[in-house]
Amino acid sequence: TFKENVFTSLFPRRKEVPKTLIFAKTDSHADDIIQIVRDEFGEGNEFCKKITYSAENPENTLNDFRNQYYPRIAVTVDMIATGTDVKPIECLVFMRDVRSKNYFEQMKGRGTRTLSKDDLQKVSPSASENKDHFVIVDAVGVTKSKKSETRTLERKPSVSMKELMMNVALGDKSEDTLTS
């Protein structure tokens, strides 16, 4: 299990759990994970927190996760999955599958930020070196599941919705029409 391996094989010289981000399927799933993590580690509310759009003060909690000692573990559904920079994250735990290749790459990107030893020690005092790697814990087979390519819509701004609908109704099945 994660708890058993975090101090032995994953981060053997650490005294505190490295900053860890857990990806959950739903808000309810996130709540269940938080309770289990707190129970397993024997820690209180500050140790593991939910950072979702529906959580209380998600921006404050995210800022604490980024810059403070607590929380050590954050659980999210989608809020931190893309476009959020939390450099001290050293471990990603996937408790949900992801079908989109691009989305999965963005989720993995949460762990890719490098950090100097001095900056890492501000939130993880027992860190003894620069952060130059991260660990993925795949609890659900997300690294092996088939991913689909996604593409952006290429809507032609000069074509109105009415005109697009008319073209489809008249049998136009061209790629340009169907992706606009």
Report each predicted region and the residues it spans.
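Short, charged low-complexity intrinsically disordered segments located at boundaries
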Residues: T26-Q35, V135-S145, N167-A169
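Long, largely alpha-helical accessory region at the distal end of helicase-like NTP-driven motors
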Residues: V140-S180
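Conserved RecA-like P-loop NTPase helicase motor core
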Residues: N45-T152
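Alpha-helix initiation and N-capping motif
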Residues: A30, P58-E59, K101, H133, ...
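Conserved C-terminal RecA-like helicase domain
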Residues: T1-A74
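Glycine-rich, flexible loop segments associated with nucleotide phosphate handling
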Residues: R14-I22, P125-V135, S158
